[in-house]
Amino acid sequence: NVFRWTYASVADFKAKPGMAGVPLLAPWADILDEQAFYANGRRYAFDMELGNVRGARPGHGFLTTVDQWQVTDLRADARSAWVTSTLDVFRDPAWMQQFPFAHRITMTYRLQEGVLEVATAIENLSAEPMPVSIGFHPYVKLTDSTRDEWTISIPAKTHWLLAQTKLPTGETEPIERLFPDPQSAALKDYNLDDVFTDLVRDGQGRAHARITGKAQQLEILIGPNFRGLTVWAPNPSGTGLG
C-alpha cells in the first residue's frame, strides 16, 4: 500500500476522521490570509461560530472528512475497478453559509494496471460565476526504503518564497535555487512545505512528480487544469532546506 492510512477500518475513520489517503481539499485548497475570500468583486466573510472553518488563516477548505458523499456507480471489469461518488454541496446550510455557491462535486476513483486515477467534475448550479480552487493532499510512501534514502523529482520551473506564516510573499525564484537538480533531489537534505508553479508538462498536458527509493518508484501525474504544486515533506529532524 503506497498510501499512509492509520485506521484499522472505515468505522475507526468515521469515529475520528483525520487526514490520510488522498483527501479532497475544497472549496479552497491551501491557506487563506484571512477568515474570508474574494470573488466577483465581493468579500465573503466566514462565520467562525459554525465551527466548520477554523484558524486565523483557514486551510484545506471544510470538506475533507464529510460523510455526505453518495455512491452513484461501483463496478469492475477484467482490467479495472472504479467508484463514482457525488457531493451536493448546496444541500448543507452550514456549507452554503460559508461558501454561497450552489454546486455539485462528482469524483471517480479508477484503479487500472497499477495506476489510480482520480477524475473530478464540478457543476456550478448557482446563478453567478463560482471560484474554483480545489486540490488533493495525497499521503504517500515507499516500502522498500526510508525517507532518508528517497529522491524526488519536481516538474516545475518556479519556486515561490514563503513568509513564516507559509503564505507567499509574492517573490519567486528559479527552482534550481532550491534544487540544483530538480529531477533528482535527495529528500534527506530538505524540510519541505513549498509551492511550485510553471509546471513542466508532457504532450497530454500532465506534469510528472516522482518519489524514488531503492527499487520502487511512485509517480504522481498532475492534470492540465492544475497550475501549481505544493510539496509537503517535513523532515522528522526539523532540519533541511525549504
Predicted feature locations:
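A short, structured loop/turn motif at beta-sheet edges
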Residues: 38-43, 72-83, 110-115, 144, ...
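Active-site pocket scaffolds in enzymes
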Residues: 218-242
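Beta-strand-rich N-terminal accessory domains
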Residues: 1-51, 207-227
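Residue-level recognition of well-ordered beta-strand positions that form the cores
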Residues: 86-88, 104, 108-110, 119-123, ...
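Extended, loop-rich substrate-binding clefts of extracytoplasmic carbohydrate-active enzymes
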Residues: 49-113
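Hydrophobic residues embedded in beta-strands of well-ordered beta-sheets
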Residues: 81-83, 116-118, 207-209, 229
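Acidic (Asp/Glu-rich), glycine- and aromatic
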Residues: 115-151
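Active-site/ligand-binding surface loops and adjacent short beta/alpha elements
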Residues: 139-225
